């Protein structure tokens, strides 16, 4: 038996005659009369429905939702703009439509409500029903306290210095090395302070780079990441941890050898103690990063670097301002500030840019038009890889210098000088590495073949594209084009600050260039997005979608 409740007459206001008429007899959702005792007129939030295939669903019986569902184009989530209703709405009516669930009367009598925006009920809930009080109702306060505790713990090791080193002389040498200055900003000043956690998360990042390159050379390792799912990724992560310990030992030895001119008593005991402390500090920082990732409020590696850059920002900005006032270069200071603001705006714009591919679902059939209705889309971000290519590129450029300090080979020393910021090979090598890591990381996160198979299993298809290999080829083409745009964007970030420095004749934010701004903006937007998703999921847990007994059905 096909059952559904009839739409109340007061919900028909403003609808065309065709929309008021009952569905045809061949419709999979054919209404029947409801008993007189059943209250059908009050404005209910949800009414249960049952179709011939035994599927359960809900029908929003408020006037705003009836206007959305009764029209010829059923688009409750408002993912498409080609509907006639969306073309005729004004921005003012859209605003009042979104705010209607918040300020509207729950009794339904007397006052008429504005139509909701074409984005639908789900978007209205997301946009208008989240306030500051919702943050304190779920587990988010506890998660944020844990996050702040982990971040404070990671900063503690930066202020515990190695003994027996002339830090003033080393800090003066650090000012002359731009690449070390950049790495110092990533460690939050840990290298300049010679803290036991000065290596930070860099050894773990280097280990990730090596395993991602090995995955291209050894297909078994690539299959372990992709085909074995979560279990395979955990195995690769465990191997990466072991490799990061090896990288930490090598980098600790290199840093100790680099500190030799500034050490009062360079003995074997001091070397072993310092290498052990630096290695343990790196392992400890990596452990904290993984615990932060488990909170699902953002990537632990990115958040650790985010905290380090934030802690480094005041001193860096103060140094630039002091230099500008000392030289009387006020125009250059204004140029740097304006460039910084434009850089932030550009990063936010590109970070939120998406390429949306519409999807058709075979199970979503419109009884009024007799056609399949598009009700979802596949989003691809222009900069889907985020800040990881820049972090990988910076760590790769620092690797020759570390190896040169460890081995003392002349060609490595020359390569390190050429790859330093301002060197002959720094800019082209940095751009090429960013493009490579961006392309690779994009396809590491999104496998076109796997994505095509998932769409096929879910009964979804891209319009005018055959399921299977054709869909995979189409997705690969889209990702190729997106990766080119993302690489160009990241290359501009890498090259832009040096051009600003040449124009303003100031050392603009030593170690705090476009890469650091991208990390800050990317981490902030990612964390805000995940907090919003957590609040919305918490609110949906309290919604009763199939409360049939409540209405006597």
Swiss-Prot record:
Which topology term describes how it sits in the membrane?
Answer: Multi-pass membrane protein
Q: Where in the cell is it found?
A: Plastid, Chloroplast thylakoid membrane
Report the record's Gene Ontology biological process terms.
SRP-dependent cotranslational protein targeting to membrane, translocation
Instruction: Quote the InterPro entries the UniProt record gives.
Output: SecY, SecY/SEC61-alpha, SecY_CS, SecY_dom_sf
Q: Name one GO cellular component term.
A: chloroplast thylakoid membrane
- Report the SUPFAM superfamilies cross-referenced here: Preprotein translocase SecY subunit
Transmembrane annotation, as ranges: 144-164, 194-214, 243-263, 270-290, 297-317, 330-350, 384-404, 417-437, 482-502, 505-525
Its domain of life? Eukaryota
Show the GO MF annotations: protein transmembrane transporter activity; signal sequence binding
> Which keywords describe this protein according to UniProt?
Chloroplast, Membrane, Plastid, Protein transport, Thylakoid, Transit peptide, Translocation, Transmembrane, Transmembrane helix, Transport
The entry's family comment says:
Belongs to the SecY/SEC61-alpha family.
Q: Which HAMAP family match?
A: SecY
Described function: The central subunit of the protein translocation channel SecYE. Consists of two halves formed by TMs 1-5 and 6-10. These two domains form a lateral gate at the front which open onto the bilayer between TMs 2 and 7, and are clamped together by SecE at the back. The channel is closed by both a pore ring composed of hydrophobic SecY resides and a short helix (helix 2A) on the extracellular side of the membrane which forms a plug.
Q: Can you state the subunit structure given in the record?
A: Component of the plastid Sec protein translocase complex, which is composed of at least SECY and SECE.
| Name of the protein in question | Preprotein translocase subunit SECY, chloroplastic
Species source reads: Zea mays
> According to the entry, what is the taxonomic lineage of the organism?
Eukaryota, Viridiplantae, Streptophyta, Embryophyta, Tracheophyta
